[in-house]
């Protein structure tokens, strides 16, 4: 049986519902399917949000 169904408290305030953390602005692929360039800049920008 999973902890959620047993009623255990959420000790670390982990968020399992809602929006995913990854945003399209920082994705490695563009909407047209091509690869996004400059991965270091993209990852740095993702960490500064």
From Swiss-Prot:
Stretches for region Disordered: 1-49
Pfam families recorded: SspK (PF08176)
Entry's localization field: Spore core
This protein's UniProt keywords: Sporulation
Coiled-coil annotated residue ranges, if any: none
Induction conditions: Expressed only in the forespore compartment of sporulating cells.
Cellular component GO terms held in the UniProt record: endospore-forming forespore
Any one GO BP annotation for this protein: sporulation resulting in formation of a cellular spore
InterPro entries (UniProt xref): SASP_SspK
Annotated Basic and acidic residues bias: 16-32, 39-49
Family: Belongs to the SspK family.
Official protein name in the record: Small, acid-soluble spore protein K
Biological source species: Bacillus licheniformis (strain ATCC 14580 / DSM 13 / JCM 2505 / CCUG 7422 / NBRC 12200 / NCIMB 9375 / NCTC 10341 / NRRL NRS-1264 / Gibson 46)
Recorded name of the encoding gene: sspK
């Amino acid at each position: 049986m999973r902890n959620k169904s047993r009623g255990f408290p959420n000790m670390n305030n982990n968020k399992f519902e809602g929006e995913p953390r990854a945003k399209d602005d920082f994705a490695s692929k563009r909407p047209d399917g091509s690869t996004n360039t400059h991965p270091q800049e993209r990852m740095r920008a993702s960490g500064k949000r």
